Curated annotation (Swiss-Prot):
PROSITE patterns: USP_1 (PS00972), USP_2 (PS00973), USP_3 (PS50235). It comes from Schizosaccharomyces pombe (strain 972 / ATCC 24843) (Fission yeast). Interacts with sfp47. It catalyses: Thiol-dependent hydrolysis of ester, thioester, amide, peptide and isopeptide bonds formed by the C-terminal Gly of ubiquitin (a 76-residue protein attached to proteins as an intracellular targeting signal). GO terms for cellular component: cell division site; cytoplasm; endosome. This is Probable ubiquitin carboxyl-terminal hydrolase 4.
Amino acid sequence: MSDDYFDRLFELAFVYINEDETIQSCSFRGQRWLEEAQTLEQKNSLLKAYYYYLKALKLAYEIPCRFEISVKSTHYGEFKQFQKLAIQAVSKAFTIKSKLAVKHYLPVIQISDALSLSKKSSLKVLFLNFYSQESSKGYVFSKHTIAIPISCLQSMDSSKIYDFLKSAPFHPSMVICYSLERYFEDVSLAYKLYSMLRSLKLDPHFMELANPKKVDSSLSYENYQPIGLTNLGNTCYMNCVLQCLFACKDLTIPMLQGRGLLQNINTKNPLGTGGKITSAFFSLLQSVLLNHGQRSISPRNFLEIVQSLNRDFSIDGQCDAQEFLNFFLDKLHEDLNSNASRSPIAPLTEDQLSAREELPLSHFSHIEWNLHLRSNKSIVVNNFVGQLCSRTQCMTCGRTSTTFAPFTSLAIPIDDVSHVVSLQECLLKFSAPELLQGHDGWHCPVCKVQRSAKKVIMISKLPEYLIIQIQRFKISVMGRKKIDTPLGLSLQIPSKMLVPPSFQSGIGYIPSNYNLFAFICHYGQLENGHYISDVLFNNEWCHIDDSIVRTVGGITDLREDFSSSYILFYKRSSLLEEFEDKCPKMTLKRNVK
């Protein structure tokens, strides 16, 4: 592997120290990065582990460049401890680097390609399934599969492998190796097998098992095809939200894996539904995956459960898609919240609140997020919940008051104009400082009187799935009004456009791009409007209007649909993941047709 690969990875492990940071906060961040690297290394997630080791080592170098440090410096001991740990991590980083080089030398094949090749009569493809558990032994992709105990490979005696290969009915033109138990994430083990098979003049490839857990094949997300949902009387608001959620793989796939989520329902949580909403969603998801060619299915059972829990969602009146989305995600979270029973933290004293304001914002955010996780843990939190920071500053004495709050959707304003407005303009308006003065002034705890103040809202932590609500409905003295301003198509949002520099130095911040994969449009007026959704499926956009599903004609049609968008769904793709996808590695050279 060329040095260019590691040079680019080194550049990607960017380290930023914000102006409000201290030696203590930087040392704390560095130690957390080292801990994360060690955890990832134990999980054989080598690229990410190496990335965090690099960030920690670079931070250990940057701290003395940024701060004047001496034995008398405040928190000198904490920095020395971090520096000591960083020095110890150098050898670990070099070890991982060598493993990465070997890993990307090994030829890889996707499951779909392997299955296609196995059906070609002109090729003699042999599969080798390395296992330790009997349940994994029967996991086969072809009748020409040899199951080999992993102990044969782990031992120093390679003759046992040769004995198994002798039982093959033919001399294979290609050997495809895999392990349901992910043994080949151990690079040294994979390389040992590769060298052994090459010495026998065989052509080995390692199959990537993207989701190795055995699930009901009929319920596999691989079988998903967009299917219409019947409108049961003004239920387009619900149908379009469900279509977008079906496209969230990190929500749907775990629900299909042996009903794992259904077994984790917290029936004792009074804020939940006792599993009603979760079970209803799972049943609907089953129907979608088992549609067997139907053009549409009825979500009546799901709707009845929703209405039994919240009578606001009546089929007789107009309902808001965003309100339904908030309701559903909230109840799904409470059903699956494994930390719901934990007692809340006692409120802070005035002195503690004052001391907290002195912390660097990124450090402050990390503490508040961990406090939130103390009583909130679910698949919804893992994927859909981010964090907002609200900071108010007195314009007389400079005192600040900072609060953090979780969010599942970002409500951003849009100007009421006739020309096209970009999403970036809306985001800038969302984060623009607000002046509080006069009757709307802020009661400063230092000045003890009402003062003019500046208030700003910032995104301090981004979720895996970013949901953005365009505030098209506003309330004025004339009543509620819809804003029909056309929105310019935005297929991708860089994280640096969303998160200010003060939080880009955070412990968990990784530079990312957010890619559009679904959106909901609202047509018409408040009283007689209609919702539709556009969803990306297999790199092709589908326009879904209740029971009707059709392919979007092209970028022009997509741009036209997006101009009326109301709720946007984006999926995070970290620059590290994009780097891993694009990095050079040996792959299958044959053309698969």
